[in-house]
UniProtKB/Swiss-Prot annotation:
Gene3D superfamilies found in the cross-reference section: 1.10.8.60, Aldolase class I
Keywords, ordered alphabetically: Aromatic hydrocarbons catabolism, Lyase, Manganese, Metal-binding
Organism: Pseudomonas putida (strain ATCC 700007 / DSM 6899 / JCM 31910 / BCRC 17059 / LMG 24140 / F1)
Signal peptide from the UniProt entry: none
Database matches in InterPro entries: 2-IPM_HCS-like, 4OH_2_O-val_aldolase, Aldolase_TIM, DmpG_comm, DRE_TIM_HOA, PYR_CT
The protein's annotated pathway: Aromatic compound metabolism; p-cumate degradation; acetaldehyde and pyruvate from p-cumate: step 7/7
Organismal lineage: Bacteria, Pseudomonadati, Pseudomonadota, Gammaproteobacteria, Pseudomonadales
Active site: H20
Domain called Pyruvate carboxyltransferase: residue spans: 8-260
Protein name per the record: 4-hydroxy-2-oxovalerate aldolase 2
Family listed: Belongs to the 4-hydroxy-2-oxovalerate aldolase family.
Amino acid sequence: MFDTRKKIYVSDVTLRDGMHAVRHQYSLADAERIARALDEAGVDSIEVAHGDGLQGSSFNYGFGAHTDLEWIERVAATVRRAKIATLLLPGIGTVHDLKNANAAGASVVRVATHCTEADISQQHIEYARKLGMDTVGFLMMSHMTTPTALAVEAKKMESYGAQCIYVVDSGGAMNMYDIADRFKALKDVLDPSTQTGMHAHHNLSLGVANSIVALEYGCDRIDASLTGMGAGAGNAPLEVFIAAVDRMGLKHGCDVRKLIDAAEEIVRPLQERPVRVDRETLALGYAGVYSSFLRHTEAAAHKYGLDAFEILVELGRRRMVGGQEDMIVDVALDMMSRKPQGTMRDVISH
């Protein structure tokens, strides 16, 4: 059941996940304009970082137009009400980077690991709590493990000090039943004081629906982005999600019209590749592939004269996870030397 008295914590990710859609090339002026619009529209937090988190700017993931600290400082100087969040992947970002991000203005951190690797988040979660940050555990590619196993990992993050645990559908591969099962499993083991969050991707066009189902099962925080700006087919489109929950009578604290205008007038014109469900982004959701693989895969397909869809299907068959972007070229080279075996149906295993 929905609690119409409870306010949804609206977490915008346009300036972090949305980085993937522009190959991490937001200008500082872009960041300022987007942040101001979001702040005025009433979101609770604005996540700011390279698409792959603090220190993600690299040959493997793509170099950013600016440093994380430059983006964070500009946004922190712009907003008047919203909190500044950032993302950290252990092994890419360090506690030193987290300390600097906090000093630059970030008061919320989401510590992200693969859904079966919560163990590697302990140092970073504990350090974030020492800094006094709102500390979130972020279990990526949550479709790749069972609800019960995911709950075990969530409990680990809680034991390290995380105040909120996210179900993260990085591949946009889950449906409403998958989401319900995972939130029920988390609620069964987490302390009632520990919040939960939902990070959806729209590769199967279920980003908004999955976010609403998460709310039905007690979710506290919802990630979304203007126009869905994000990896793959994007995240749950913020303006659509808020319009939908507004019609349901749920409390969100946002100005629907301001979000719609910001999406159309500020963010959509920045899309160099339309953020939408199409052949390649649908392949991500169908095959359960990490959404940020999209642009890297399209580049490899162009370079080697291959079909991006088939590369993505093969990546799904091999169960590649976030951080294995370097394997995209390996897969492409393998496909050049032999005809892919199996069918698309071989990719899916529920």
